[in-house]
Design a protein with these regions (language model features):
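Glycine-rich beta-strand-to-loop/alpha-helix junction loops that act as flexible
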Residues: 5-9
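Structured mid-to-C-terminal alpha-helical surface segments
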Residues: 1-3, 13-19, 30-231
C-alpha cells in the first residue's frame, strides 16, 4: 500500500486511455505518514529499489542505474526482437519518493486498478487459460495515480522544457507526452476536466509542489510558455 503506479504506462495498462508501447515504468512511494521525515521517504525508496534490482538481478544494469536521493532510475536489459523502431535499449524503472517539507501539500490522487498483462488477454482470447496460471500471468490489483494528476505532470514538464534554448530537441524526446495529452483531450471525461476549475486548481497545486522541490523551475509562467505561443 506504499507503492503507486503512475505515468504514461499507467494510462495504458491501468486505465486503458492510450495505446502505445512503453519501456518505462514509473512508481511513486510514500510511507503513508505525512509526518514522516524526508529521510524516511528516501529509505523506503531505497528499500524498494533494492528489492526490484535483486528480484531481477540477472538483467539489472547497475552501471547505468541512478540510485541516490529521492529519485531513482533503474535500468534492465531485454532482448529487442524488433530493430530500428525507436525502442529504447533498456527497460527503465523510475521510482520517486516525496521530498516535500510539508506533505499536507501533496497532490497524489490514487485509485485501485486491475492490471492485466497483454499476453494474458491474448491467452484468454484463444482459450489457453491454463497457461496463465502455469506462468503466473494472472491479473492483479494495484494503486495507481489518477490520470488527472498525470495530465498536470505532463503539462508541467512540457512547459518547463519549452523554456530551454534547445526546446525543440528536448520536446522531441518527450513527444510521447504530447501524444498522451492529445489522447486524453479526445476522451470526453478528461476533456471536461481540462476545461474545468478542478484542472486549474490541480495545476496550481502541482506548481506549488514543484516550487518546494530541489532544482525547481516553477517560477516560469504556464500561460506565457513558448509551447503555447501559437496555440
Amino acid at each position: 500500500d506504499k507503492t503507486y503506479f503512475k505515468g504514461g504506462t499507467s494510462l495504458s495498462k491501468a486505465y486503458g486511455l492510450i495505446e502505445r508501447f512503453s519501456e518505462d515504468l514509473d512508481l511513486f512511494v510514500f510511507t503513508g505518514d505525512k509526518g514522516a521525515s524526508k529521510q524516511a521517504e528516501k529509505t523506503l525508496n531505497k528499500k524498494l529499489s533494492k528489492y526490484i534490482a535483486e528480484l531481477n538481478s540477472d538483467i539489472y544494469k547497475e552501471d547505468l542505474s541512478e540510485t541516490g536521493g529521492n529519485y531513482r532510475k533503474l535500468y534492465f536489459s531485454y532482448d529487442n526482437v524488433f530493430q530500428g523502431v525507436g525502442l529504447k535499449e533498456h527497460l527503465e524503472v523510475e521510482i520517486k519518493s516525496c521530498d516535500l517539507p510539508d506533505k499536507k501539500l501533496m497532490f497524489y490522487p490514487a485509485d485501485k486498478r486491475v492490471i492485466k498483462p497483454i499476453v494474458t488477454s491474448f491467452l484468454e482470447s484463444i482459450g489457453q487459460d491454463e497457461l496463465i496460471s502455469t506462468y503466473g500471468l494472472e491479473s492483479f490489483e494495484t494503486q495507481c495515480i489518477n490520470p488527472r494528476k498525470t495530465i498536470c505532470d505532463k503539462v508541467s514538464r512540457l512547459v518547463k522544457l519549452s523554456y530551454n534554448e534547445d526546446a525543440t530537441a528536448l520536446l522531441a524526446k518527450h513527444i510521447r507526452d504530447v501524444y498522451d495529452l492529445s489522447a486524453l483531450y479526445h476522451n470526453q471525461e478528461y476533456n471536461d476536466y481540462l476545461h474545468s476549475e478542478d484542472f486549474l486548481d490541480a495545476m496550481y497545486r502541482v506548481t506549488i509542489e514543484d516550487g518546494l522541490n530541489k532544482n525547481s523551475r516553477s517560477h516560469l509562467s504556464l500561460a506565457d510558455a513558448p509551447i503555447f505561443k501559437d496555440a
